[in-house]
């Protein structure tokens, strides 16, 4: 199966999570105009008994294409955000929430440089 990689936007990604972007969102200059603050970009969700929010940094290796999708994973108790630390684009492969991933509903999205994504809890995705 080959997937077409879609250009991401807030609407077409909404069933999987949120696009993280500073474009066209409310911002405010703070700290005597030395910093621009962008508010309320994502909804971090923590479910279950372990109600701690953790921030991790992952260093991913560049993938070779065509990419063989041989597994999907999900995180049943929390959302998961990916925001590149360098100017780079990346591709995410996702499937809607279900008990097991529906291979007929897999979608791929290209995330532009300087943007990120936040997977909702239980959304299936290929590991980055």
Label each PLM-derived region with a short phrase:
Residues 82, 125-128:
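Short beta-strand His + acidic residue motifs that chelate non-heme Fe in jelly-roll/DSBH
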Residues 111-124:
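Conserved metal-binding segment of the jelly-roll/cupin
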Residues 1-108:
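Non-catalytic, conserved peripheral segments adjacent to functional cores
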């Amino acid at each position: 199966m080959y997937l077409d990689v879609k250009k991401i936007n807030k609407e077409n990604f909404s069933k999987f999570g949120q696009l993280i972007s500073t474009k066209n969102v409310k911002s405010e200059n703070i700290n005597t105009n030395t910093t621009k603050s962008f508010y309320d970009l994502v909804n971090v969700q923590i479910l279950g008994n372990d109600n701690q929010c953790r921030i991790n940094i992952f260093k991913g290796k560049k993938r070779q294409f065509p990419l063989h999708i041989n597994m999907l994973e999900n995180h049943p108790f929390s959302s998961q955000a990916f925001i590149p630390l360098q100017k780079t684009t990346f591709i995410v492969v996702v499937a809607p929430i279900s008990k097991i991933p529906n291979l007929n509903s897999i979608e791929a999205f290209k995330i532009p440089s300087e943007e990120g994504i936040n997977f909702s809890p239980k959304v299936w995705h290929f590991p980055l």
